[in-house]
Amino acid sequence: MSALGDVIYILGFLFPALGLISRNYLVNLMAFIIGTVAFLVFVQGYTDIAFSSSTFYLGVLPLLLGLVNLGYFFNWLREERI
């Protein structure tokens, strides 16, 4: 599971970064989901990097990027749909 966990973790950085650049609402929503999954994969120990207090920022970063994408999604929802 280590190789798959590493791939999911890397996608957890790349996909939310793409969502921040593209500003597409579907990409933003999917980036939130992938960022959250990457956080869970890292915290549960499915990557080669050991989870500790010194590497906590590595786990939180995909989650934070995903939350920014969720904010962009709700901003789009407020502007376009309500």
From Swiss-Prot:
Protein function: This protein may be involved in virus assembly.
Name of the protein this chain belongs to: Uncharacterized protein A-82
Source organism (scientific name): Sulfolobus spindle-shape virus 1 (SSV1)
Pfam families from the UniProt entry: DUF5493 (PF17597)
Upper taxonomic lineage: Viruses, Viruses incertae sedis, Fuselloviridae, Alphafusellovirus
